[in-house]
Amino acid sequence: SDQVKKENAVFDKYGVKNIQQSEEVKNKTTKSRRSKFYDSLLTTDRLRSKVDVLFTKEEYIECGYYTSFKFRCKTCSTEFLDCLEDGDVPVCPTCNKLSSTFQTEVYDFIVSLNITPVEKNVRTIINPLEIDLYLSEKKLAIECNGLYWHGEINGNKSRNYHLNKTQLCEKKGIRLIHIFEDEWRFKKDIVKSRIRSILSVTTNTTFARKCEIREVDVKTSTNFLMCNHLQGKDNSSIKLGLYCNNELMSLMTFGKLRTALGNTSVPNTYEMYRFCSKLNTSVVGGASKLLKYFIRNYHPSKIISYADRRWSNGNLYTSLNFIKKSNGSPNYWYFGKGNSYKRYHRYGYAKHTLSDKIELFDPNLTEWENMRTNKWDRIWDCGSLKFELFIK
């Protein structure tokens, strides 16, 4: 049969029946992916305005994931090491030392928005637990979570600690958001924009009816997400933008269901990966207009999406007629070894990859046991909310 002939041809060339099992093909695919990642990320405005890159594209392509590379700060000329795999822009450790007043800085920012009263270190809401900041008029609470003191080892914060506080606040009709230390340190402008949006005090307002929809290329999408979304770039295949006077104001991206989240690909079923607007800007009706365009032009039968429970209560999805399907369990990030002020996603530290990333690797230990042995800690989030939209 044709299938047998195909398998034989692949076996003759690569020594395996399935081409995806070939180490040669895997290496080519990885290098191609890293080449595209380099091209998209290292040309973003957010990176180019802050650092000089002191390595070549070839060096990046040949190295393994989560390898540290050298950068030079454009402000103070400090040279430092950082990795790119998490999609964050490398940040100079000299210019961005986080003061012990993390919570005070957030407090001062909120007060500058003329939001009052703002109470500090409140124990009367979910006693005996403490809330860092409470905006009683807005029914909004804010936690400023330093990585060290909110880690599982150093801070003795268990898997459900942050989620539990969120749920206790919800029972009181209070929305709780958690700001992780590295978000405030590295993406302060985006965090401030999110807080403004939650408090409905954005600087600029435009209306979707005055905007036109365009398909957006990878470079433009990457640049916009890196500058305006806390989670940064994505691997979406469909990118839709709202333009006003030729300026990109909002972006919504879609793609296949992600297997890493336990999903299997289903025909005509898509995941909404990202939605964001330009910093400090409210685009009234933007999400609805982009979603309707996607449905009209791509004919999905179902769309799913996930809301980060640290930041979102899912109100955007319910306004778009999504139905909440489930509550996801908390996820964790690693931090500590050589970089105690930055989180690294667990996907980059699966046990089968650890032998090349840590000094002391024991195949008889679990991933977490190996990381602990090497002086890493981890911090848990609040999980995610899964939403679904069925299209008739």
Task: Kindly label every feature range from the protein language model.
Residues 1-226, 230-237, 276-314, 335-341, ...:
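Nucleic-acid endo/exonuclease domains
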Residues 46, 206-208, 247, 265, ...:
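A generic structural signal for short, non-catalytic loop/turn and secondary-structure boundary residues
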Residues 70-72, 143, 241-243, 386-390:
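Short, well-ordered beta-strand micro-motif
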Residues 130, 237-239, 382-387:
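Short hydrophobic/aromatic beta-strand or adjacent loop that forms the aromatic wall/cage
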Residues 133-138, 242-245, 389-392:
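Active-site beta-strand termini and strand-to-loop segments that position acidic
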Residues 210, 269, 384:
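A residue-level signal for beta-strand positions that form part of recognition/binding surfaces
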Residues 215, 236, 244, 250-375:
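Acyl-donor binding region in acyl/amide transferases
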Residues 369-374, 378-392:
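Charged phosphate-binding loop/patch that engages nucleotide di/tri-phosphates or the phosphate backbone
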